[in-house]
Structure formats: C-alpha cells, structure tokens
Amino acid sequence: MCKLFPAVRLLAVAMLIFLGASCSEDVPGFVVPTPDDNKDNTQTENPKPDDGKDDLTEEPIANLCDEEFLGQKPMIIAYYTENSSALPDPSCLTHINYAHGRFVDKETGDGGIWIEKPELLEKVIALKQQKPSLKVLLMIGGWGDKADGFSMMARDARKRTLFCQSCKEHIDNYGLDGIDIDWEYPTAGPSENGRHPDDTRNFNLVLKELRETIGNTKIISYASSASADYVDWKTAMLYMDYVNVMTYDMGDPPYHNAPLYYSAAITRKRSVDQSITQHFAAGVPLNRQVMGVPFYGHGTDPYKDDVKFNEMAGIFSSSKYEGKNIRKWDSVAKVPYLVDESGNFLLGYDDQESVTYKGQYVVQKNLLGAMFWEYRHDDSQGTLRKALCKAIYGSESTTK
C-alpha cells in the first residue's frame, strides 16, 4: 500500500487539474498556476482596440450639443476659405465654417490637424465681437487630396484619439464653436484617399470619440454628399448635431448643377428636394438638415467648368459670349441656365431668383437652415447671400 500512495496522489492531482479545480488547499505543497503567476502571460489589461470593432455599444445613447450652444435658427451658414481676401459680412449669417483644417500627415492621417493662415481665422472669430450670436466652426477635409488622411485615421484607435484631441486643442486655442467634418466620402471618393470598406463604421467611432472629447457645449456637423449613401445615419446622428447636405454638383451641361426639383429633360440623377428626402428616409430629421446652395455653376465651351456667380455679370455684358449667353428659366427645376442660339445647354447656375426659391423651400420644409459654398463666389453687393437671407428671414439681416 505505501509504495502505491505516491502514484495515487499524482493521479488525484491530475484529475483535479483536468476538472479545473484548485488544489492549493486540497493538496498540500501544490499550487495550480494562475494567470498572474504565468511568466509567459504578457497581455495587458483592457488593451485599447485598434481595429474599430468594439468601441460602439449595441444601443448607444444620443450625445449631442446642448441646444443653447447650437446658435441661431434658421441657420444661414457661409463656407469661408483661406483663399478669401475680404472678411465676411456677418449681418446675414448665423454661422461661418472656416476652411480648411487638414491632417499634419495626409498620407497616414497621423499627427492631428493644422490650419493654413491661422491669422485669417483669428480675424473671422473676431467678428463675434461685432455679432455675439455668430458661431464659427473649423471645417476639416474637402474633396480630392483635401480629404486625404480620414480613412487612415479612422481605422486606427491611436490616430482617432490624436485627431480628436487636436480638434479640441484648436477649439480651445482659437475659441471655436465646433468642428465641421467634410470627409468625401467614407468608403468612396478618389482611390488615392485610401478608402476602405470599414470607413462607414469607423466614421461613427470618430464621431463618438470626438463628442466625448469636446463635450456638449461644442457643435459637430458633417458635410454630406447629395446622396445619402456612405454613412450609417441612424448611428451617426447620435453624435453629430446636424448635416450640411451638399445639394449641388449634381450635373454638368447639359444638366443642371443644383435643380430644386426634378426636371426630366435636364436633371441628371437627383434634385435638391430628392436629396433632402433621401436623407430624411435614411434617418436624418428635416429639422437637422441644412440645405446646400452653390454660389457657382458648371459650364461647357466656351465657359469654364466652374463659373463663380461674381463672373456672371461679365458674361452677360461681354461680346465674347454674344449669342451664347441666352438665359433660360426651368419652371419645374426652379433654376436658370444659359443656351446658345440653337438652344444648346452651355451653363447651369444659380441666381437671385433660384436662391429665393431655395430659401423659401427651407422655410416650407422646416429645415434647420441653408448653407452656401462659398462666400467669395458672391458678388461685391452680396446679391445671393442677401436673397437667401431675405427668403428665410424676410429681410437682408438675420437680426430678429
């Protein structure tokens, strides 16, 4: 019996280990290793995910800017770029989106963001002394290489955190009222932007962390394509306050650039109304949509691809365009266009009449407001911005 006992004891220990029982007390002198005692266990506790797969809860709670910090409604938002010379007149504006903020390293989306001509931004923010209700946001991104870095940043947890912290630093340093994100577009856009199939989900991770970082006293807005594709709106709207719908660039000649309503003969894909409706169906309430108005048009020979509104007066007065500058009005689409003597569509654009219809649409549909791209494309008299303001506010000033 005594010679058999060690073997029996070892068998008992083996059975206990197999069954997952701790034998530190049951078998004197033997301790089952725990994870802390395992010298090969080098995993850290709660590592920060880097794949963007488990940062979103299944039932996220809405986290938005407090109402008192959103600014005046209806909104009239001007995009104002670093290429501008004259400062904007804030009298008919409620918000200004200063463009552009860009990634420090656009190839990788790393290093946070930077601003070209920060001294100009400071002058724009100083307009709040003249009009205290004015809100100034920093627009980050844009089309083409201006959007470089978004996809690479959004898929990496460390870069997301750095991006959000950099946004907060700029908000604090300059006294900004928020951030306008112009990622064109998650999962789409030029291939050189590094687009990725997970962009849509990763975008929500960016929004969530940005909200957590800047808090509920600052605005988060997004410049959306005329199409409601690319974004998971039901989740995104839990973190962003409103959407600037870019209801333009919807057609080149012989099609309208930004038709208010669908006109079968000369509307390419969709109208402004269809775009607003599509965003609503996708989960963006009408009272959180800001309708885009282009202060430019699209042309074909003899015109440039892009024609600013402040160039239109010269087009009508110059002999260079004689016989090719005949204004037509599309009574269905509610926009003008130019044709030649044979009736060929040469230039689609917006003018005072069409902008008035669009401002009235904002009021009729109870939208949050209107925005326009861009301030410097208006003429020196402010013809378009004043027409937009008058259609929405009943006067050429937003002062109530």
Segments (PLM) and residue ranges:
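Conserved, mostly hydrophobic/aromatic
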Residues: 96, 138, 181, 243, ...
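Glycan-binding loop/region signatures in secreted carbohydrate-active enzymes
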Residues: 56, 60-64, 140, 288-361, ...
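Surface-exposed amphipathic alpha-helices with a cationic face
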Residues: 66-70, 121-137, 141-142, 203-218, ...
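Substrate-binding surface in catalytic domains of secreted glycosidases
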Residues: 105-119, 165, 186-320
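Bacterial Sec-dependent N-terminal signal peptides
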Residues: 1-4, 16-70
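A cross-domain feature marking catalytic cores of carbohydrate-active enzymes
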Residues: 80, 100, 138-142, 183-185, ...
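Glycan-recognition patch characteristic of GH18 chitinases/ENGases
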Residues: 55-171
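Active-site and adjacent substrate-binding regions of carbohydrate-active enzymes
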Residues: 168, 172, 180-226, 349-400
